[in-house]
């Protein structure tokens, strides 16, 4: 494949790259000579052999400016070709560019085009790969021209003949062979590459395309149409590769451009016969080097061996042809040549790959050099090694400013050496470069002074691998230090995810002025305080700093100086320095500004000052008038560093408060002030952490005395569960789940009590509690293990299916302070090892997810300001989500542009105008305005920009709180924002020691807040039963599915919280009841779905037979028989149907209700038993995912969603709104019908035994699942459309990150990725466009194809029109109108036309891997996966890569089209002249118009 013309590829400026199949002429045009010998170098002289694979005559000299024989040496002979050895005198670097060629004795088929799936050659010739293989490898003859003998024998073109058949025809029609080869009467049949070459040459692409399109239109056979379509795709690819090229020729004797005569357009493109090679290109020798080792041996590239095989076999074949060897020997040699060339191009695809002699590994062919992680694309083009860089271990630099890093002198002098040398020579300290180097080597003191001046104002870039997001590389101002380790500021550790246990970092020096400027303005660490993924601060104090600030701002009663009154903060500091007042003393300070406090000072006043005191009344009035402040000395010290505009922070500063404060500072006072504040609180934090002398001792871990009581109670409860199981009222699964629940609850109670115990210890100054409460280190989970009980341990299993046995049901009762027994220690090792193994295994999964995300979104760049769309995304206030800790309404709209006015429905006021950016203040206002239930916001999901996206649809750049700028690479930011937490969280697993978390299946649901109850669709029955103590137990049981309870504000009527009540729940309240917070509303059985009787009557079993549809399991411990429905489908005889169901029959024998019983159900009634409403008939066990707590469980789920995979057992979803009814039953499936009021009916077939959620007569909406199982995203797209599936994917992925990991990712990042998944449409009917049915194309390309034919019409009868007009032709309407006017004038027959048919399509949801491979850019797709396939398809179609994305520009070595690399910035010129400025402005504005429509 030739990428560009000219002797040196890819030099100079180019804007796009075309891929095509190299013709023999283009290979020869690039070649500098033919390689005739297989030798590489002479083993005696070590010089390249003439005409060999390393020949200097062909590829250029091995030494700069010196020919092979040594006649010409030195640069003055540049360009001369030596008359003795024929070598051109030039630089040795040409050996990286100059190519050679091998002329083959016979044509050879290129393996890529023959072995690719589907085979390109096979599609053109309509031959299967197997048949092609037999022809290519000289096993059978193929008929090229049947001629007269063929007609007589009934042989057609492309028929395969054996050797006997071929010779029989040749001998029978001997005279026929004397005819000329061009004579159509001559019988021609050949084998091998030559035959394929002749066949491909004879193909008429236009005629083939017409024939195939006819088959597509007219054939009724599906198979024929599918085959025709497959072939047509390849034919159309070849036809598309033809592009008109303007050619000119010179006048005879003309020399100048004006003497050129334009010729008619010449069509140049891929010809099918180019897939068969007559000439093989030989790549430059420096790209397949031969390196001498010690001991006279050589290391060589595998390609040299592969080329040698080709040359040896080719030369042998030429000799055999010359001596007219027998056909059998020739044929064998030709086959071997074909195999040698196959191995050269793609050795890995063959079963019998060519292997090396010593290590017996397959040789790396040209294809292997391109693909995979070690291939050319990923190893050398996307990831290069960088000069002016170094790496070293990092240590903390607590005295550094936020924008500084400590750079070891020895490292700095190496990195900045050229600059130091220049400065030394300029200042006359050294006479020459050589003497300057000597000064540096001697480490002369003056060198350090010069180095200081050189690095002043020159930032360096620090990078820590793995670079998971853009904050993994930041710029710092270097400070020279002694030692060998790099020092970094403690606050940037979070961004780099660095710690000081031996981590290393790399330093890079930006060289050019522009690079230094960008590093200082964009990448300086003090400008990167906000995380792009969520808009939250990243430079948040941690560990010692937090502990110091927490200790400083905490109050303690009884401290010296408590209750004193101070005039201002200066007085407080003087008193503290004089030791008249304690650090934690509660004091009063006169203050009149803004105060941020969360407590009521009037309540606290009584604890500080005695009510009877004379000061009490005055202080109270001062506090009420807000002229006085009740605070602590420590808080006064802390507030010395807080900017005045923020006010006085009168709170205990823990990590959360610090994070909020830094976020506020960043948006209100800017980065400069925030950076100062951060440096100050770093000093304060470290200082007071040291002053407090906070460390943990064994006595600080306090075990609560109540622990023993709780454990005894839990043991009693679990014994009770076992008794119930023994009585047979519980299944083994339920017993397991309930025991796990008992211990989970107990563990949590003990944890809470031990936490409270720590809190009360030493007035809250217990060091362990302080570390925990401040957020400095540790979690409640770890305190539970230290002072409570270790609790339940997860059994390490890769599957997260929730099968019983995921959690070991015997808990570890001891805690780490008391110490574990041997058995407990042994059980613990499970979890600890799981953590360690997960870390290594799952990191790779997360890294691969990041790579796929990156590849799919890398070309999403903000290209225009506003796409002008009128569509937006509807965001609703969801009460259920907001109270369960999911993303709030304000977070969803923050930083977006309103698509329409947002109204307060209670008073009809406009809260936010359309087109306005929803700032933090506006988002808070919307959240707090009760009347705003929904908002329509601009979103990238609805952006209509043709290339990239527009800044209005994206909204604000989260890291700078401003509308995103044109040129921002938002796709890459999105991929990093999603990938980084995935990787981080897998690494965090092992800190928990593998204890089971989450998992409590809450059986009681309590009211979240006060209010009045309102019921929606709640249908209940009253049920009475006798409990264990013989007392009647009356219960209200819910029998309706998806009923809801709302808690309503009695004054405004606004719904405060909504609960969905599970089927079978016990209600503890009534509609209209007033409820208090934490009052129990209902309780439910979490471990199973219950089938409940809704009417009284007798039970009758249908199709429930022992040993056929259910099995009886007698529990060995209890002797109780449990009846479980089994998978009975395999036991059915032919045409036999069964469906286990339980019917309820009234006294008259009429069936009142039928309940289908799914597989795995446990039966709770006997045949003929009497039941009452509310009785449990059967239970279907539910799988609970109990091992939560880290994203490891969630990562496969995220991958499944991003890959848009269909779940293994998907739910059947209704396609229309309507009512459910059940139809007839076949052998193993039954019908579910949904019929609407308009008579439309849809029928679904459900496997018998699958749990059906809908009942007879239930109303369902389009998109509602009717059976259990996960809903397939493909179904949502098909039924509810693209908007619904986009929302579904974004919400589901957010759930995994939010619930499993508590990670905040802004919706807009997920939207960018989901947008890329829905970019393509599949053509259904091509109409009159040039598209093909089944084509997968960009939505914008589809719209364009339809627009192109919108103004055209189809000619149905050409009438008396000229010959250029044909029936069936598409012409412009105005041209036909003009022609008809002419025809009418001349009284001729008019042209009859009809309107063109538009193409139709449907949207397609692609997984991120498929979407990345379907990208418009060939280079980007090839560097991602399936390199050879992508390049083969691109070459056949003559695809053009317009270099619009980032990846393809990095690969070809150009500036990326993002940020300052945008086209519009490349034309900027700097000038001081105002007239020139106006001219420049005009020139720059002109190309901008073009940019408007096309993005970049």
Swiss-Prot record:
SMART domains associated with the record: RPOLA_N (SM00663)
Binding site for Zn(2+) 2: 867, 943, 950, 953
One GO term of the biological process aspect: DNA-templated transcription
Coiled coil: none
Catalytic activity: RNA(n) + a ribonucleoside 5'-triphosphate = RNA(n+1) + diphosphate
Gene3D superfamilies reported in the protein's UniProt record: 1.10.132.30, 1.10.150.390, 1.10.1790.20, 1.10.40.90, 2.40.40.20, 2.40.50.100, RNA polymerase II, clamp domain, RNA polymerase Rpb1, domain 3
EC number: 2.7.7.6
Keyword Transcription: yes
Keyword Transferase: yes
HAMAP family xrefs: RNApol_bact_RpoC (MF_01322)
PANTHER family assigned: DNA-DIRECTED RNA POLYMERASE, DNA-DIRECTED RNA POLYMERASE SUBUNIT BETA
Self-association state and partner proteins as the record states: The RNAP catalytic core consists of 2 alpha, 1 beta, 1 beta' and 1 omega subunit. When a sigma factor is associated with the core the holoenzyme is formed, which can initiate transcription.
Name assigned to this protein: DNA-directed RNA polymerase subunit beta'
Organism: Chlorobium limicola (strain DSM 245 / NBRC 103803 / 6330)
């Amino acid at each position: 494949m030739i990428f560009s013309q000219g002797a040196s590829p890819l030099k100079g400026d180019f804007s796009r790259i075309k891929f095509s199949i190299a013709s023999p002429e283009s290979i020869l045009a690039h070649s500098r000579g033919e390689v005739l010998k297989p030798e590489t170098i002479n083993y005696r002289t070590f010089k390249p052999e003439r005409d060999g694979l390393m020949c200097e005559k062909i590829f250029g000299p091995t030494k700069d400016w010196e020919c092979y024989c040594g006649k010409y040496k030195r640069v003055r002979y540049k360009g001369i070709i030596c008359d003795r050895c024929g070598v051109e005198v030039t630089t040795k670097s040409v050996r990286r560019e100059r190519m050679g060629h091998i002329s083959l004795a016979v044509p050879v088929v290129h393996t890529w085009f023959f072995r690719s799936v589907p085979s390109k050659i096979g599609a053109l010739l309509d031959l299967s790969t197997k048949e092609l293989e037999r022809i290519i490898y000289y096993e059978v003859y193929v008929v090229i021209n049947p001629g007269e003998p063929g007609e007589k024998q009934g042989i057609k073109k492309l028929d395969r003949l054996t050797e006997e058949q071929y010779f029989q025809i040749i001998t029978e029609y001997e005279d026929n062979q004397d005819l000329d080869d061009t004579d159509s009467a001559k019988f021609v049949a050949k084998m091998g590459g030559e035959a394929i070459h002749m066949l491909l040459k004879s193909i008429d692409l236009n005629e083939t395309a017409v024939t195939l399109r006819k088959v597509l239109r007219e054939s009724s056979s599906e198979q024929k149409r599918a085959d025709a379509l497959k072939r047509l795709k390849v034919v159309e690819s070849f036809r598309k590769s033809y592009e008109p090229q303007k050619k000119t020729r010179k006048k005879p004797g003309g020399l100048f451009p004006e003497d050129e005569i334009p010729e008619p357009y010449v069509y140049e493109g891929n010809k099918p016969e180019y897939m068969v090679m007559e000439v093989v290109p030989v790549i430059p020798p420096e790209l397949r080097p031969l390196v001498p080792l010690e001991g006279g041996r050589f290391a060589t590239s595998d390609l040299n061996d592969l080329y040698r095989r080709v040359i040896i076999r080719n030369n042998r074949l030429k000799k055999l042809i010359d001596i007219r060897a027998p056909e059998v020997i020739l044929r064998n040699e030709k086959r071997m040549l074909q195999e040698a060339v196959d191995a050269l191009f793609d050795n890995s695809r063959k079963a019998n790959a060519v292997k090396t002699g010593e290590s017996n590994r397959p040789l790396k062919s040209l294809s292997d050099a391109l693909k995979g992680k070690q291939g050319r694309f990923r190893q050398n083009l996307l990831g290069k090694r960088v000069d002016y860089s170094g790496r070293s271990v990092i240590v903390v630099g607590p005295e550094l400013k936020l924008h500084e890093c400590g750079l070891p002198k020895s490292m700095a002098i190496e990195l900045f050496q050229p600059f130091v040398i220049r400065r030394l020579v300029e200042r006359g300290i050294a006479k020459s470069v050589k003497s300057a180097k000597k000064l540096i080597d001697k480490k002369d003191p003056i060198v350090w002074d010069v180095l200081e001046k050189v690095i002043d104002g020159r930032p360096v870039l620090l990078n820590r691998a793995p670079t998971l997001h853009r904050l993994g590389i930041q710029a710092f101002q270097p400070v020279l230090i002694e030692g060998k380790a790099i020092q970094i500021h403690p606050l940037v550790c979070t961004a780099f995810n660095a710690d000081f246990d031996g981590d290393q970092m790399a330093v890079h020096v930006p060289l050019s002025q522009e690079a230094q400027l960008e590093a200082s303005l964009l990448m300086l660490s003090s400008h990167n305080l906000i995380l792009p993924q969520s808009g939250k601060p990243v430079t948040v104090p941690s560990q010692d700093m937090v502990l110091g600030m927490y200790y400083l701002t905490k109050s303690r009663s009884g401290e010296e100086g408590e209750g004193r009154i101070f005039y201002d903060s200066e007085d407080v500091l003087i008193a503290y320095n004089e030791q008249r007042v304690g650090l934690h003393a509660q004091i009063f300070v006169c203050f009149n500004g803004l105060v941020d406090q969360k407590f009521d000072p009037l309540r606290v006043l009584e604890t500080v000052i005695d009510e009877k005191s004379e000061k009490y009344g005055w202080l109270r009035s001062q506090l009420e008038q807000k002229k006085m402040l009740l605070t602590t000395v420590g808080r006064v010290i802390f507030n010395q560093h807080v900017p005045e505009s923020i006010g006085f922070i009168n709170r205990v500063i823990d990590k959360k408060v610090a994070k909020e404060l830094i976020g506020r500072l960043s948006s209100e006072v800017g980065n400069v002030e925030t950076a100062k504040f951060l440096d100050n609180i770093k000093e304060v934090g470290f200082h007071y952490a040291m002053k407090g002398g906070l460390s943990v001792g064994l006595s600080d871990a306090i075990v609560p005395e109540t622990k023993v009581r709780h454990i005894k109670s839990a043991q009693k409860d679990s014994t009770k569960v076992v008794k119930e199981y023994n009585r047979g009222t519980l299944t083994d699964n339920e017993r397991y789940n309930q025991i796990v629940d008992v211990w989970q609850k107990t563990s949590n109670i003990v944890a809470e009590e031990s936490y409270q115990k720590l809190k009360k210890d030493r007035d809250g100054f217990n060091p362990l509690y302080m570390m925990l409460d401040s957020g400095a280190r540790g979690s409640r989970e770890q305190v539970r293990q230290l002072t409570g009980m270790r609790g339940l341990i997860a059994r390490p299993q890769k599957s997260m299916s929730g099968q019983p046995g995921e959690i070991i049901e015997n808990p570890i009762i001891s805690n780490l302070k008391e110490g574990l027994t041997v058995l407990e220690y042994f059980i613990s090792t499970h979890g600890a090892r799981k953590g360690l193994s997960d870390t290594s295994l799952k990191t790779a999964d997360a890294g691969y997810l990041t790579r796929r995300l990156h590849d799919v979104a890398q070309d999403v760049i903000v290209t225009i300001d506003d796409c002008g769309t009128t569509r937006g995304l509807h965001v609703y206030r969801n009460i259920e989500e907001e109270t369960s800790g999911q993303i709030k309404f304000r977070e969803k709209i923050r930083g977006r542009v309103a698509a329409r006015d947002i109204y307060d429905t209670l008073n009809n006021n406009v809260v936010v105008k359309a087109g306005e950016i929803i700032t933090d203040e506006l988002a808070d206002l919307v959240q707090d305005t009760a009347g705003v239930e929904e908002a329509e916001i601009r979103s990238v999901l609805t952006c209509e920009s043709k290339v990239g996206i527009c800044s209005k649809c994206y909204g604000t750049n989260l890291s700078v709180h401003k509308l995103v700028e044109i040129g921002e690479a938002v796709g890459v930011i999105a991929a990093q924002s999603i990938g980084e937490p995935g990787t981080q969280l897998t690494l965090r697993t092992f800190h928990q020691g593998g204890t089971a978390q989450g998992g409590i299946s809450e059986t009681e649901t309590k009211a979240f807040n006060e209010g009045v109850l309102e019921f929606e669709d709640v249908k209940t029955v009253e049920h009475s039963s006798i409990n264990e103590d013989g007392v009647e137990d009356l219960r209200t049981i819910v029998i309706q599915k998806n009923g809801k309870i709302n808690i309503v504000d009695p004054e405004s009527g606004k719904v405060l919280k909504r609960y969905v009540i599970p089927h079978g729940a016990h209600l503890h309240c009534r509609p209209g009841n007033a409820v208090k917070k934490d009052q129990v509303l209902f309780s439910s059985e979490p471990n199973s779905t219950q089938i409940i009787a809704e009417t009284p009557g007798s039970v009758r079993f249908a199709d429930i037979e022992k040993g056929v549809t259910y099995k009886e399991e007698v529990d060995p411990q209890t002797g109780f028989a449990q009846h479980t429905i089994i998978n009975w489908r395999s036991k059915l005889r032919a045409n036999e149907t069964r469906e286990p169901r339980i019917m309820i029959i009234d006294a008259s024998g009429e069936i009142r209700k039928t309940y289908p019983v799914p597989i795995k159900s446990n039966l709770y009634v006997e045949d003929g038993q009497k039941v009452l409403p509310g009785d449990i008939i059967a239970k279907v066990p539910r799988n609970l995912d109990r091992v939560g707590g880290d994203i490891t469980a969630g990562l496969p789920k995220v991958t499944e969603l991003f890959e848009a995979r269909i779940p293994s057992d998907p739910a059947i979803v209704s396609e229309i709104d309507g009512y459910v009814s059940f139809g007839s039953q076949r052998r193993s499936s039954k019908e579910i019908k949904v019929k609407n009021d308009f008579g439309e009916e849809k029928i679904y077939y459900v496997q018998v035994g699958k749990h059906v959620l809908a009942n007879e007569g239930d109303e369902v909406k389009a998109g509602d699942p009717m059976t259990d199982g996960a809903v397939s995203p493909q179904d949502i797209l098909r039924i509810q459309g693209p908007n619904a599936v986009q929302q579904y994917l974004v919400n589901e992925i957010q759930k995994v990150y939010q619930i499993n990991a508590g990670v905040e990712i802004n919706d807009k990042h997920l939207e960018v990725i989901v947008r890329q998944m829905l970019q393509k449409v599949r053509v259904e009917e091509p109409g009159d466009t040039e598209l093909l049915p089944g084509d997968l194309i960009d939505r914008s390309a589809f719209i364009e194809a339809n627009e192109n034919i919108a103004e055209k019409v189809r000619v149905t009868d050409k009438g008396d029109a000229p010959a250029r007009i044909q029936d069936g032709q598409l012409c412009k309407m105005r041209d036909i109108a003009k022609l008809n006017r002419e025809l009418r004038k001349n009284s001729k027959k008019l042209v009859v036309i009809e309107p063109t048919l538009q193409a139709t399509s449907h949207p397609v949801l692609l997984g991120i891997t498929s979407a990345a491979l379907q990208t418009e850019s060939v280079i980007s797709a090839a560097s991602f996966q399936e390199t050879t396939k992508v390049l083969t398809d691109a070459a056949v179609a003559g695809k053009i890569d317009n270099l619009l994305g980032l990846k393809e520009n990095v690969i070809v070595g150009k500036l990326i089209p993002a940020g300052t690399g945008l086209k519009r910035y490349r034309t900027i010129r700097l000038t001081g002249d105002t007239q020139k400025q106006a001219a420049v402005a005009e020139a720059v504005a002109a190309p901008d118009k073009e940019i408007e429509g096309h993005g970049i």
